[in-house]
Amino acid sequence: GDVYKRQGHAALINVQRICDYVATGLTFDQAIELVRASSLYTVHTPVPAGHDYFDEGLFGKYMGGYPSKMGISWDDLMDLGRNNPGDKGERFCMSVFACNTSQEVNGVSWLHGKVSQEMFSSIWKGYFPEESHVGYVTNGVHFPTWSATEWKQLYAKYFNESFLYDQSNPKIWEAIYNVPDEEIWKTRVTMKNKLVDYIRKQFRETWLKNQGDPSRIVSLLDKINPNALLIGFGRRFATYKRAHLLFTDLERLSKIVNNPDYPVQFLFTGKAHPHDGAGQGLIKRIVEISQRPEFLGKIIFLENYDMQLARRLVSGVDIWLNTPTRPLEASGTSGEKALMNGVLNFSVLDGWWLEGYREGAGWALTEKRTYQNQEHQDQLDAATIYSILETEILPLYYARNKKGYSEGWIRSVKNSIAQIAPHLSLIHI
């Protein structure tokens, strides 16, 4: 049967498959051709930490008995995991082995496909990167899982009944333009209130336990304002995600969050890998900043990030913020989940957003790097975020009509759903 490897971690399954074919009487060359013809491999990140390398000694401790079963030498097996076969000093790479034993390799967005072609180009010497068998399949999301019940009910009310079976049909999604603005606004308000209630209920006990001073915690919880613009940031705290970017200029950020005419609050959540000291340091810094008087109740870090909290966030905030270092965001899917719930994206043009972004349906930071120096680039991107918040996002959100909502904001929500969502749904029967 066919085998699909979603990460390099699973690559060694093809060692066993080759052994099994050789045991039936095939030669190694015949066996590896069969294995390649029935193997697909998805690479999920260009970040080095996502690609396992093993020293020959450690690899041999566990894999030393396999070459004889495969009908090859130990060096032959090692070379299948090396960019430069024959280089005794090169470690065995699971990702290289996955490429060498798979018919097709794919990244998880158009840009990531291009990055992966360059990253693996040394495997296929003598070929241009675009000539390799590395392509892309942009990640999507499972609409029934990540759309809130309220949104599914709204879609069922206004969309063609075939929507359940053909969620990638743009014509069906265009029916969102027929939904009254008031109904979309009401649904958004409902989801925000649910998020705020969830936070107050779930985190009162946690924060009291971990942060002491009950009066301060109660005050903080009371400051969470469902009428303010809520901006969410929830993901793994890997350094390339740049969770720190918003805090580059604290004086300017303080002016933004304390503007009485345009109230805005930021909700941060996520976890760092246990061995990622830098990621843990980012969380620590955000928590410390959130406890300063000028940011108390304006910058909020939510502990114990899990699927339930993620589901509440992607349906309850107004804007989903994503600030990765270009081009290290392979795809990202949290913004796709948010979009299904009428949440607008504000992100660097990287990963899925490079393909998804449409003018008038969210906001974007350019995909191009202005500076090679990352610190300078961070400063520029932070200034751009502040500027877009001050001059575009906040004025649009608070341009309220007599009925209490922003017609321009609802127009952007409708554009986002109609023009982007059908390209992200996984269901098409």
Q: Which residues does each predicted region cover?
A:
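Catalytic cores of carbohydrate-active enzymes across secretory and cytosolic contexts
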Residues: 1-427
